[in-house]
Amino acid sequence: MSFTPMMKQYLDIKKQYSDCLLFFRLGDFYELFFEDAVIASRELEIVLTGRDAGQEERVPMCGVPYHSAQGYIAKLLSRGYKVAICEQVEDPKKAKGLVKREVTKIYTPGTVTEEFFLQEKTNNYIIALAEKDGLIALAVAEVSTGYLGITSVDEGKIEVLASEIRRLAPTEAVVLKNFKNNFLLKDITGIVNYLEKLPAEEIEIAFKGPEASKEAYKILISYLKRIEPAVLSIFGQPEFYQIDSYLYFDESTRKNLEILRNREDNSSSLLGIIDFTQTAMGARKLKEELTKPLLNLKAIADRLDAVEILVNDYELRENLRENLKNLYDLERLSIKLVCGTINPKDLIKIKQSLPQIWHIKNSINHVKNKSVLFAEIYKNLPEMREVYNLIDKSIVDDPPVSPKDGGIIKNGYNPTVDEYRKAREEGQDWIINYEKKERERTGIKSLKVNYNKVFGYFIEVTKANLHLVPADYQRKQTMVNAERFITEELKHYENLILGASEKLANLEYELFCEIRSEILKYQEDLKRAASAVALLDFLISLAVAAIEYDFTRPVITAEPVLEIKNGRHPVVEKSVGRANFVPNDLYLDTKENSLLLITGPNMAGKSTYMRQAALIVILAQIGSFVPAEYARVGLVDKILTRIGATDDLAKGQSTFMVEMIECNNILRNATSRSLILLDEVGRGTSTYDGISIAEAIIEYIQKKIKARTLFSTHYHELTGLEGEIPGVKNFTVLVQEKGEEVKFLHKVVPGKTDKSYGIYVAKLAGLPREVVERAYEILARFEDKGLKVKDTVPVQLSLFEEKPEPSGVIKELIELDLIRMTPLEALNKLYELRQKALGEK
């Protein structure tokens, strides 16, 4: 048995879009068949049925109503599927045989432009990767905003590129099937598309650059052209950027510092507390800038100048915020314009946004000569009054969403529209009068003239009045409680009314397309305006945060220094309240004070102190004021952190292995301009190993890297490194003791401590009283018996006495080239040395 003609048509189309779930239009539904139906039924939680298709068995089928398909499509996209929409492209009434169908739209996670499928405040990236001549290139696009960027790195710096991919968090990626560095794809949560080979079609390359960059660009553009043919109109020249031209921090640092989100909710993050943006464009800009702070002194100073003007001018700031509040997302609207998906309501959004641009331009006129950025914003705000006037005279103030539904063109814009509208309205008046006339003629007071899309106009008479129906009524449909009729006269006027309505809807759509084409000429102006608005909104958000939280303008310098007076952690301070937060000073350079070794109990504030230093640097380098009484920030090229210990057992990695991998990454990538934060290094292994590794890392940083470093530890023995290793300074967190009660003062001061207050912290954590009291008894017994480090055999070799000539295991340990070893080699070697050490006992 062969398939039915309709199913053959389906299978032919499905063959061309085998990587998509095919939504096949049948009447008022999109139907899915075979494996697509099984998947959609499972993912959308809809009923799986079957359909006769000319085979012995019914084929699996499920469907969704076409008018509510968006929600279902969005759900499938969020779960990593692609969807192809196959429409009926001819009127079924006029079709001879099988209705013609074809795919009119493809939706994929990384290429959607409709706001329904997008997060308003988040960019939606798609990337392509290529490798050639020792380089790996990345091409990245944001289709909904028209952004296109390209970067490349040496194959030896693959981890840097991996970090950039994590920063972008793409929802889709494209690579050739023979792409070797699959390590780069492991963190992509969306779809990864594998192409057999580079498309044969010629894609024009209008830029010079490495072959890897050109190949990545070709892969991306060829894929996008299949999804969205207007893609070349969306993008201009790609932006070439170097990852190392921004302050670098990897995914671990982003999570540790809670820059974009914390573990519980997004609001308790750095982004969450400083986001005072009024537009979607500004919100995306702020998020983007927080993940790529600047390294250019002048660019930072220009931002700080603009923020300072906004901080000091209340009237300017609040007027601009009010204007921004009434601006729509011009960036994404301009792309919908290019793609031809813009609707009448979108045009009204553009119209309503333009006067706000005029007000903004007028407001910043008096400050454009005081700031480079205000001058740039002013220059990039075209007024586009022609666009406003065209929309204002042509489109009604509250049009329907669909341009094909009619009711979008204003009266007086087009004479023919006015004529059709008059004919339709006169016809509708005739219907009202006809209903009145028929009630009088028949004596049926409940008689109604109604309309639906299936039967057109009809007369409805209840069962109780059927004996009064005249002979010229022709029965059309029998209902439970009524019957429907038509008359020759009603049919005649139906043709006139529906003819006028159809002609009117068609003409309105034609006029809408003409208006859209005219506005398309201003697409670049719209994009420029959107970019300027995003920058302005970003700067105002920084100014509002500065006022809200009492931030001050930092001094930015090229010197390798970090000096902070009464610095605060902005997120913690917001959580506990300004009055309850204890500010702290910090001074770091690369000479006398290059590594602060911080001791103190858990919960005393060591991690907060370290994190706030990094957050102050990030804020300063995006051009923001900072939470401190005074801050002098020497440009930092990388912030590298090891804070907290999170087991990665799912990947077969223990706490200690994760710790060593992260430390290895820091030591390999840090430079003298970096800021390093190391919290409790070595605690994932035995005391001997932990202290040895911690000291070796400190020595390496001080001798080889010379970076500004904050190093917290519970190994009090390490405090002896002050005076032995240049640049190491001891700092501790003040604690107040009163009997068995301990108060953490959260004040970081020069000095050291030899107490951990672990039992007290256990008490705070709610351990049973019996356990806590027993712990104090055992501690007292140890102390009474003299079981202290200074009275017994040392728990480690003294770090600071005259050292004997190394031999055996120690000599082997010293000779290890830790930086060149992989984490696995280091772990294996450590195990081997431990076995040898046990043998030497």
From Swiss-Prot:
Xref: PROSITE patterns: DNA_MISMATCH_REPAIR_2 (PS00486)
Assigned GO CC terms: cytosol
Binding residues annotated for ATP, in chain numbering: 600-607
GO biological process: mismatch repair
An example molecular function term from Gene Ontology annotations: mismatched DNA binding
Main function: This protein is involved in the repair of mismatches in DNA. It is possible that it carries out the mismatch recognition step. This protein has a weak ATPase activity.
Protein name, UniProt field: DNA mismatch repair protein MutS
